[in-house]
Amino acid sequence: MKTAIVYATKYGCTKECAEILKTYLHGEVNILSAKADKINLSQYDAVFIGGSVYMGKIQKEITQFCKRNLKQLLHMKIGLFVCCYTPKDTEGFFETLYPIELINHASYVTSVGGKMDYEKMNVLYRKLFHSLKKIDGFNEGFTEPEINESEIKKLA
């Protein structure tokens, strides 16, 4: 079986998750950037699609990839994932990120967690998070996100 993992990432976490996912898959697996690669799906039996979520939106490259390839994807085995802090069981969350047809067709749809790499963040995001951490009570309800490898294994 030949599998593609198509991803888009802002700071590298989604690519890292794609690389972890690859270790759980069998056969030939290619990791492809939705931003950089022209992707010919006809050579693949299965496709996993993942992106990171910022301000409630997934990268436009993932949205465009899904729209452009929707008909073909609906005839393939697919899995969908996001890297974010939102739990996978948040009602209606995935419907704002992926076409409903893909969600209904997918073998598995999940959030695989994520991580905050402050060194890679732009100045605005870095200042925002450092400011939030200074607010009384914020740290009580906040824990640094982590990549959920067990959820990645389920996706495979």
Per-range role (PLM):
Residues 24, 28, 55-156:
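FMN-binding flavodoxin-like domain, especially the glycine-rich phosphate-binding loop
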